[in-house]
């Protein structure tokens, strides 16, 4: 942790001290923010809804892409201007000199998942209440997501060394949480009303590798700290469970039967990033197009409704038109249900910035539009195939039209995927899971009525 030695004396509010929090970046950072606010509330701090009502502001930053770094620095500046007392944490906090050079008035800077350092910084600059109010904190902790779904982080860091990524430099190597800790947390979340668990990490399929799949006991049974046993344990809780950030390793095949049994939601988030062998090699990513296509076909033989979400990068250094055509052919043949596409940009300290053959910005832009057009065609065909079917959907909340609710199928994760516009549904509430008759579709979203 880096402190500003010219800091003012700590505040000692006459009422309960209030901390504002700004959470940027991915769901993994959101989980970090949830853990921090849980600790703050456990010690009696209030969480302020805005800058004006806060005695101090905590900014949880992202530092993965240059655009994310710029957004984080802008958010820090906004917090300083609006409040004046700012502590910075998160991925960009791993480079304190960058933050302090841009914003010398920050009170302290801590790195990612340094919860104790964050609390120490808060204590230094905002005196904690005399009597902690532990009873104010629910057993499941405090969350920044709606009541009916929650992110479940199973590990920190990553052992992969993708040439475009600096996550291992920011968050370190893979560090898996003990499986009984993860399953107990999931159990508490379900008891608190969560209907959907979203399993996240940097590499979910590598879970447990760093601790040699150490066995632990949960509910009287032994579970090894590995992807398959995690899926079995979570599948016993009776809620929707999504697996995010899964690499296409062979052992992922073992989880597909659990989806066929209805224990795990038939959904895999696999960041393929590309399909061309030369580009994947330059990215230092695993993947063989023919093998991957064959495995996807086998998965869908077992689970016809399996939805696959992925992310891709276009315009990676050295990417040729032929490479790009291979990528387009792949998303069409694999029938990728949901896809995010990003134009390559250099990341500070990433190896890819040193590669030859950087693609001009106008070519990146043109390829991005072609990718999105091709993906829209795939998604539209997948969506149209649902019309006339009756599917389970989970309610997220009210829509803009009278009597309308926004819902999702099992093929759609919150925030990033498609939605279902459910008519005549005013009697339903967030978290309800119902059967819905699909009456229409557009490129991505569905339209339905309660069955």
Swiss-Prot record:
Cofactor(s) the protein needs: [4Fe-4S] cluster
Domain MTTase N-terminal positions: 17-127
Pfam families named in the record: Radical_SAM, TRAM_2, UPF0004
Keyword Metal-binding: yes
SUPFAM superfamilies in the cross-refs: Radical SAM enzymes
Cofactor comment text: Binds 2 [4Fe-4S] clusters. One cluster is coordinated with 3 cysteines and an exchangeable S-adenosyl-L-methionine.
Alphabetized InterPro entries for the sequence: Elp3/MiaA/NifB-like_rSAM, Methylthiotransferase, Methylthiotransferase_CS, Methylthiotransferase_N, Methylthiotransferase_N_sf, NA-bd_OB-fold, Ribosomal_uS12_MeSTrfase_RimO, rSAM
Keyword list, A-Z: 4Fe-4S, Cytoplasm, Iron, Iron-sulfur, Metal-binding, S-adenosyl-L-methionine, Transferase
GO biological process terms, semicolon-separated: tRNA modification
Domain called TRAM: residue spans: 384-451
Residues that hold [4Fe-4S] cluster 2 according to the record: 158, 162, 165
Enzyme class: transferase
Cell compartments where the protein resides: Cytoplasm
Keyword Iron: yes
Primary localisation category: cytoplasm
Top-level taxon of the source organism: Bacteria
Name this polypeptide is given: Ribosomal protein uS12 methylthiotransferase RimO
Upper lineage: Bacteria, Pseudomonadati, Pseudomonadota, Alphaproteobacteria, Hyphomonadales
């Amino acid at each position: 942790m880096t402190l500003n030695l010219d800091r003012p004396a700590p505040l000692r509010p006459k009422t309960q001290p209030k901390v504002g929090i700004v959470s940027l970046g991915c769901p993994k950072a959101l989980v970090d923010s949830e853990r921090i606010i849980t600790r703050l509330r456990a010690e009696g701090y209030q969480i302020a809804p805005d800058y004006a009502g806060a005695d101090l502001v905590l900014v949880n930053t992202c530092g993965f892409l240059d655009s994310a770094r710029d957004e984080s620095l802008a958010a820090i500046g906004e917090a300083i201007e609006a409040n004046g007392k700012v502590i910075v944490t998160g991925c960009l906090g791993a480079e304190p000199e960058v933050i302090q050079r841009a914003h010398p008035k920050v009170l302290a800077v801590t790195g990612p998942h340094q919860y104790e350092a964050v609390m120490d910084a808060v204590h230094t600059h905002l005196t904690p209440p005399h009597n902690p109010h532990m009873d104010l904190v629910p057993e499941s902790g405090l969350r920044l997501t709606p009541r009916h779904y929650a992110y479940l982080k199973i590990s920190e860091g990553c052992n992969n060394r993708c040439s475009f990524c600096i996550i291992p430099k920011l968050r370190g190597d893979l560090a898996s949480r003990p499986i009984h800790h993860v399953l107990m947390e999931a159990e508490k979340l379900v008891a608190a009303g969560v209907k959907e668990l979203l399993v996240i990490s940097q590499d979910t399929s590598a879970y447990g590798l760093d601790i040699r799949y150490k066995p632990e006991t949960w509910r009287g049974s032994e579970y090894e700290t590995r992807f398959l046993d995690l899926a079995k344990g979570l599948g016993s809780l009776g809620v929707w469970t999504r697996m995010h950030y899964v690499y296409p390793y062979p052992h992922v095949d073992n989880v597909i039967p659990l989806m066929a049994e209805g224990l795990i939601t038939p959904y895999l988030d696999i960041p393929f990033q590309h399909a061309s062998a030369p580009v994947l090699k330059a990215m230092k990513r695993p993947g063989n197009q023919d093998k991957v296509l064959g495995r996807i076909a086998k998965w869908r033989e077992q689970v016809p409704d399996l939805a696959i979400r992925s992310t891709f990068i276009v315009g990676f250094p050295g990417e040729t038109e032929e490479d790009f055509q291979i990528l387009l052919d792949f998303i069409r043949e694999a029938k990728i249900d949901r896809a995010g596409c990003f134009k390559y940009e250099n990341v500070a300290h990433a190896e890819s910035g040193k590669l030859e053959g950087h693609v001009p910005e106008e070519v990146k832009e043109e390829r991005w539009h072609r990718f999105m057009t091709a993906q829209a065609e795939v998604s539209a065909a997948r969506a149209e195939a649902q019309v006339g079917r009756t599917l389970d959907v989970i309610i997220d909340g009210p829509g803009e039209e009278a009597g309308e609710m926004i819902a999702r199928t099992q093929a759609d994760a919150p925030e990033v995927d498609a939605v279902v516009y459910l008519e005549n549904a005013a009697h339903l509430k967030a978290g309800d899971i119902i059967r819905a008759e699909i009456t229409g579709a557009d490129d991505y979203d569905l339209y339905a009525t309660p069955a």
